[in-house]
């Protein structure tokens, strides 16, 4: 909780501003969307902001604003997670210092079997869906969201599946960042 004025807080650290939206052609539905998304997009933008505020070293950029805009071009499952992972690479490529990568994955259950990185049909099946954004080096959870009630044992299994997916993704992202760094230097 921030105490004092907003301007004082911005004088001490950077403001992370996020926008999340779906392109009009990204889904099969043909309903008209507002230009900057709907209520769900606003909620996901807030989650994105909270996830990156946990990772970006905002104190190094007082009186600054870091904008992260995510637009999903093809909504085929795990949209928010794909946006988080892409934004992580973009922030790193921009040279903004971070405590750790922010890696995100979904998880769910298919007949008691935990699944990670759900596709659109798996998400649409209606079972409980878990979204995990993780800082893998520290194990800190930046975001944990569950779409339905779930028994504790099943929750632990789904959380473990999402955590393993995030750690595997971290290895892939880290390898890509290191290759990019070799190209640049």
Which residues does each PLM region occupy?
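Polyanion-binding surfaces on beta-sheet-dominated domains and ring/shell assemblies
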Residues: 1-185
